[in-house]
Every structure is written in C-alpha cells, then in structure tokens.
C-alpha cells in the first residue's frame, strides 16, 4: 500500500535545497521507502463502514420503507459521492463543501494537506494518540488513507478519475519547498514549546507518535513546526491582504480546512471530528475505486493490484442487493443496464 505525505516529502527529501529537483523522482523515492502492507486496522475500519451502508440498504429493502427509486439512489450515492454524504450527515455541507473541489484530485490535495496539519496541531489528537487505544486506531486509519490517496494522486494518477491535476500538485510542492527552505532557519525546531505541558510529556508523546506514525522524532518535530508556520503565514496573509502572498491558493485551501477542523474540534468531541475526517476519506476511496477506468484496474492488477481495485470489485456487486425487493423488474433492469454498459460494440463485430 503506497504512502505519501506531502509535508514529510518536503522535510525529509532535501528537495528544497536543489534547483534541479524532479517531483516525480522525489515521490517515487519517498513512496518506495514508505510502502506498507495494508494495516488490519485500516481494513476493518473501511469494511465496517461499507458493511454498515449495505446493512442499512438491506433493512430498508426488507421493510419496504423506501421506493425503488430511493433504494437505487442509495446505491448510486455509494458510487458517486466523494465526501458530500459525510458532510451532509454531520451538517457540515454548507460550511465545507468547497473543500471537496470540482474534481476528486483537488479534493484529495486539499484534504490531505488539512489532515497532515490538523493531526500535527490538534492537542486533543496528540493526547488521544497517546492515551486512547480506540482513537489512536482511528488516527492511524485516517493518516494511512490520507497518505494512500495522496500516493495515488502523485505516483499513480491513472488510478484516479477526472482531469489530471498533476500541475497543481507540483506547484503546491514547489511552493511548500520554497516556504520551508526560507523559514526553517528563522525558528529553531522545538522552540517555544507551548504545545505540550512539559518536556517530559513532550518526550512521551513524541515516542508514542513515533511508534504510531513510524517516523523519527526529528521528523515529527519538524512536521509540527512546518504545520505551525503554515498556519501563522496563512493568518498573516489573510489579515494583511497586501497582495504579496507567500502561499499559493491550493496550499491555502488545505490550511484553511485545517483551521476549520481545529475550530470544529473546539466545540465538539475529538471523536466526532475524527469520524468526519475518516468518513470523508473512505468516501473518496470508494469513489476513486468505482470511477477509475477498467483498463487502469486491469493494468495495475498485473503489477499486484491496488486497494482501490478491491473497492471497485465490491462496488460492482452492490447492485446484487437489488434482488426482488422493490419490484419484479428491479433485478432485470439492473442486469440489462450492466449488459448495455459492457456490450456496446459495432454491429459489424457481432455478425
């Protein structure tokens, strides 16, 4: 399972020090070093959520509480939404729908940056990672899915639907690398130290986070410092509006979302905020798997396959639950639609 954290890519790669950097090579290098076996925790989190959706669907079918159109809409939503359902379920759609972007890839970039910054700056998340095994498991699932989707965007863009936004990714990395290069020497890592109550608690937290994130304590400290500097710069840009903005709009979108998630945390439990973030990532994963082309799935299968391919196969079989529940023609209509979709060939080829 490929992994790529943009903040860690900038911090650990030394890319900011080279003028001839190639983001393709940097991403390949990083992802090879960070590739992991799909954690059991992540499998369970994802499949439990999918199972919950299917159970709800079957309950409605058995109880005949929904019309045929409503049930088909439920199935369609499972295949066509990329975060909208989660935001609607938590009454956040009006406030955060902009963060999903017009294309999946822009949504991934925004939510990935926001996730990295939020997990670095949320004191509640840090405490949860250290003291609560259940929430620590959820945090691990969030970061793993976030890094996986970012890996697909940067290294396997053919596995994602929609317009290729590679240039947006490169511009964001370039902007972030320049920012880190110019600002990392102005403030020493670990200075200030007002995030945690004491040096002993800081050491304990860093050790726990090191085990959870599988990165060095130095990387954790540097990532926290970079996230803190990005938020401060974003706030300064918004306050002064002088036109001399250091952060491009794509990076700014991620920082703005991180700020909103931190604000949401101030009036809600950490559990709820983590549920929102995880649910959005699961929706994006499911959408990416179903909307990716069959050719890309087949090509990747020859190289070992992707998690999104497993998701796609599951999505293809969701329609099997529409059997004799709402009307006599439901199953027939479903399979006729599938036949038309996969059997569109010129008449001359069928002679």
Where do the model's predicted regions map?
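Extended, charged interaction scaffolds in large complex subunits
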Residues: 1-351
């Amino acid at each position: 399972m490929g992994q790529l954290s943009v903040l860690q890519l900038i911090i650990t790669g030394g890319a900011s020090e080279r003028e001839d950097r190639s983001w393709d090579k940097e991403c390949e290098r990083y992802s090879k070093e960070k590739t992991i076996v799909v954690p059991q925790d992540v499998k369970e989190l994802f499949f439990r959520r999918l199972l919950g959706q299917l159970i709800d669907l079957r309950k409605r079918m058995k109880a005949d509480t929904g019309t045929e159109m409503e049930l088909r809409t439920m199935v369609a939503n499972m295949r066509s939404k990329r975060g909208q359902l989660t935001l609607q379920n938590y009454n956040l759609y009006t406030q955060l729908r902009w963060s999903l972007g017009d294309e999946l890839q822009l949504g991934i970039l925004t939510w990935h940056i926001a996730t990295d910054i939020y997990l670095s700056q949320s004191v509640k998340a840090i405490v949860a990672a250290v003291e609560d095994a259940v929430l620590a498991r959820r945090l691990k699932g969030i970061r793993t899915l976030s890094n996986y989707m970012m890996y697909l965007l940067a290294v396997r863009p053919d596995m994602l639907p929609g317009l290729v936004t590679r240039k947006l990714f490169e511009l964001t990395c370039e902007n972030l690398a320049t920012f880190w290069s110019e600002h990392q020497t102005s403030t020493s890592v670990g200075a200030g130290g007002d995030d945690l109550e004491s040096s002993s608690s800081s050491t304990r937290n860093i050790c726990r986070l090191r085990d959870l994130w599988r990165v060095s304590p130095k990387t954790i400290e540097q990532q926290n410092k970079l996230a803190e500097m990005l938020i401060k710069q974003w706030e300064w840009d918004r306050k002064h509006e002088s036109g001399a903005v250091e952060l491009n709009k794509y990076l700014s979108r991620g920082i703005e979302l991180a700020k909103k998630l931190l604000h949401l945390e101030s009036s809600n439990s950490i559990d709820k905020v983590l549920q929102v973030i995880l649910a959005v990532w699961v929706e994006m994963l499911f959408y990416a798997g179903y909307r990716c082309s069959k050719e890309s799935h087949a090509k990747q299968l020859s190289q070992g396959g992707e998690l999104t391919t497993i998701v796609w196969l599951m999505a293809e079989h969701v329609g099997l639950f529409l059997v004799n529940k709402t009307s006599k023609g439901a199953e027939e209509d479903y399979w006729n639609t599938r036949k038309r979709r996969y059997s569109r060939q010129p008449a001359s080829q069928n002679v």
